[in-house]
Every structure is written in structure tokens, then in C-alpha cells.
Amino acid sequence: MEYSPLSIVITFFVFLLLHWLVKTYKQKSSHKLPPGPWRLPIIGNLHQLALAASLPDQALQKLVRKYGPLMHLQLGEISTLVVSSPKMAMEMMKTHDVHFVQRPQLLAPQFMVYGATDIAFAPYGDYWRQIRKICTLELLSAKRVQSFSHIRQDENKKLIQSIHSSAGSPIDLSGKLFSLLGTTVSRAAFGKENDDQDEFMSLVRKAITMTGGFEVDDMFPSLKPLHLLTRQKAKVEHVHQRADKILEDILRKHMEKRTRVKEGNGSEAEQEDLVDVLLRLKESGSLEVPMTMENIKAVIWNIFAAGTDTSASTLEWAMSEMMKNPKVKEKAQAELRQIFKGKEIIRETDLEELSYLKSVIKETLRLHPPSQLIPRECIISTNIDGYEIPIKTKVMINTWAIGRDPQYWSDADRFIPERFNDSSIDFKGNSFEYIPFGAGRRMCPGMTFGLASITLPLALLLYHFNWELPNKMKPEDLDMDEHFGMTVARKNKLFLIPTVYEAS
């Protein structure tokens, strides 16, 4: 018996409709969910995001104005809660933090980071607690970050020399910043520049664009035939295989080096890099949960991705905002040039006095948080603000909207670093109107590493050079379009013209 293509398609969509009706009935009959917009069969509220002509975080903010700071959406098969106010964020990340400590299990991390065994996406439990402890006490502690200061100093010196040689001509500042951070993190993680560094950084960027949480496969996880059409899994696996080959080679070389040192055949008593630390802990036998080589690769991948793309994007946005707001740029430069007064070498220890530069960084992270939609998942049925949030509900904490909430921020969409002058608000997740690094148990453990990677290059760029937009572009004409992913970067590269500052 033969079936026509039309009958197959009709059967498929009837199945989808029945599947949706069953899920919708169960939801409505058992839970009082927060308000949300009307939804269509099968796709739910996806059409509202698809037709918004803006990025997801911005489209969600527009819906929030109508439905409130705790809003329910049905994104395909996924029941989703959107949190868009400091008060509701505190409920999720402090009051009921342990109820929402899980990460949604997305397709890309499952393959990219070895079954989601990195610090960002590992399921909540003994393994995750151990990895977080290792990151906090060993890999990303203030002492460890400080031990890499000579690397940051060296790589930033090379950056300034490179820009100096191109002074007077437009340069791809975005590319230079990403290369700076890639080399810096590579030396900290692997002990030296990696031969495959350019390819590895390219793979990192591809992976980040695949981990935004709005892929079809993530929104319709049970519809396997649909996954064959999107080929998302194949794309992720291709990136993973190429990255794994590079990481495998790095681990092999580290293991060989450790063997030579143990046997007394090597003189490589170098400073421990991050791979060395993880291998030492693995071999120590002191870990409650044994660590595999794949676990090590997952953690290193995570640190590399966060340390390069997140920091480079923040520097991009800081320079973009100052080019858009030249008075801010001039004020930051005046502070630097007054304090250092013709000094040739500026070190990290010199930066404590730069109060306005610190405010510039804070304001950049308010308007451009590294992760604009922080993903969580409910693991214990919870009542919040009179609504019952069922287990497995995906939660998206919209840090982009929270940082622009007019109830907490005057002139919320304007870049005004002065708002942080004499302010007690910090990065530590205690002020829920300002959570660029998250808050609670899942707060980013790499905050200290990230801030150290941002502050020195920004200071040097402003101190050593004056900056102009190319083609006599006016500040108001500089585009600020975003490219959405796990990290939200500029959509278009930032090209600027540097001229060397000569102290009078």
C-alpha cells in the first residue's frame, strides 16, 4: 500500500495538533500560570518573537510592558517563564534559588561540552558542586587571576604596539580585541599560545551562536524528524569534533610534559596553567567525584569561551558607547592622562585610582550584559507571586530588560557612567537591578578573571590613542546592532581610526 506525500504531511500535522492539545489541557487543568500573550497551536508564542523584528531579549521586553514582569510563554513544546524585574529576579536567584538552580538541557551544550559537564551547563548535583568549587578555589580565584597578570601585561603591550604601527588608518578593533583575549586566555589555560588558536577561536564563536536557546531542536525536543530537517545536531557535532581534536592534542602534550618532569627527564618547572591544575587534581585521588579527561576538556572549553568572547564583546561595547558618546570618552581619557601624566608603562596595580573608568565599565555591563537572557529551570514546584511554577518550566531572566528598567534607572537607555559615582552597586549579585554576572548559586565564577581582562586594555586604548570614526562618520550614525547568541556581540565589526597621543 502506497501513501501520498500529502497524506503523510497531514498525518504528521494531526499528530502535532493532538500532541499540543494534550499538553495544553494538562497545563491549564493543573497550574495557575502567570499571564502571557495568546498562543497558536503547536508553535505557541514563537510567532510573537519571530515577527518582532528585534532580538529575543528586546522582543520579550515589549511583551512584558503588557503582561508584567513575570510572564508565561509557550515556546514550541517548552513552557517558559520570562523574568524581567529586579523583584522577580530576586525570587528566582535568591529566595527560591535552589528551586531554580538547574540549567535547561539544550542540544548544543550536550554535544559541545561533553554531555554538559562544564561549569555553565552541568546539571545541579555533586559533580556540579565539585566543579564550581574547583573553579572558585583553584582555577579562577583572585590569587590565580593575579598570577596571570604578567601574561595580560605582555599581551596588552603587543596590542598597543600593533595599533601604534597602524595609526592614522582604520583598524578592525573588534578583531584585535578578540585576538588579544584569545591569546591571553590561551596562555593562561594552556601555558602558551596554541598553534591552532585561530581555528579554536573561530570554533568558539560558532558554538556561542548555537547556544542562544532559540534553536528549533531545543524548542521541539521530542520531534526527532524535525531535527533531521534543521541539521542543527550535525552542525554542532561538526564543530565539536574539530574542537575536540585540538583539545585532545593539548591534553596529550601536557600529559607528556608531566611524565617527563616526573621521570626527571625534563626541566619544565613552569608556572601551572589551568590544564596543569585540572590534571593535578584528577591524579590526586582527592576528588569526591572522579574527573575524566572529557570533563577537563569541557571545563577548559567553557573557560576559553567565556574568557574570550564575553570579555572581547564587553570591550567592543565599551569603545562603541564611548564613540557614540564622545564626552564620556574625553572624560575617561582626561582621568587617565591626568593620573598617569606621560607615564610609559601602566600596570594593573596602577588602575585602582581610575574611578571614572570603573564607572564606564559598570555602565557598559548594565546596557550590554554578557548573557542577556540567563537560563534556569524549575526543579521543585514553586509558588511565586501567587502563581504556581511547575517542575521543568524553563526560566529566562532578562538581564537586558532589568538593566534598563526605568523604575530603577533614570534615562535608562542612555549611556551615563556618572550614575555609578559614589554608588554601592557592585557586580556581586546583591543588587538585583544590576546582575551582569548573574546571582545566586549559578553566578558566573569567572567574574574576577573577566574584569581583569577588561580593565587594563580599555585603559591602555584610551591612554595611548585618540580615536575617530572612519569616513567622517558622526557619532549618532554609528550602528549599535547586536548579534544574538549565548553572548550578545556587535553584529558588525567596529572599525576605528587611532592616532597616537603625545603628552605635551
Curated annotation (Swiss-Prot):
<dbReference type="InterPro" id="IPR052306">
    <property type="entry name" value="CYP450_71D"/>
</dbReference>
<keyword id="KW-0479">Metal-binding</keyword>
<feature type="binding site" description="axial binding residue">
    <location>
        <position position="444"/>
    </location>
    <ligand>
        <name>heme</name>
    </ligand>
</feature>
<protein>
    <recommendedName>
        <fullName>Cytochrome P450 71D8</fullName>
        <ecNumber>1.14.-.-</ecNumber>
    </recommendedName>
</protein>
<dbReference type="GO" id="GO:0020037">
    <property type="term" value="F:heme binding"/>
</dbReference>
<dbReference type="GO" id="GO:0005506">
    <property type="term" value="F:iron ion binding"/>
</dbReference>
<keyword id="KW-0503">Monooxygenase</keyword>
<comment type="similarity">
    <text>Belongs to the cytochrome P450 family.</text>
</comment>
<dbReference type="InterPro" id="IPR001128">
    <property type="entry name" value="Cyt_P450"/>
</dbReference>
<keyword id="KW-0349">Heme</keyword>
<dbReference type="GO" id="GO:0004497">
    <property type="term" value="F:monooxygenase activity"/>
</dbReference>
<keyword id="KW-0560">Oxidoreductase</keyword>
<keyword id="KW-0408">Iron</keyword>
<dbReference type="GO" id="GO:0016705">
    <property type="term" value="F:oxidoreductase activity, acting on paired donors, with incorporation or reduction of molecular oxygen"/>
</dbReference>
<dbReference type="InterPro" id="IPR002401">
    <property type="entry name" value="Cyt_P450_E_grp-I"/>
</dbReference>
<dbReference type="InterPro" id="IPR017972">
    <property type="entry name" value="Cyt_P450_CS"/>
</dbReference>
<dbReference type="InterPro" id="IPR036396">
    <property type="entry name" value="Cyt_P450_sf"/>
</dbReference>
<dbReference type="Pfam" id="PF00067">
    <property type="entry name" value="p450"/>
</dbReference>
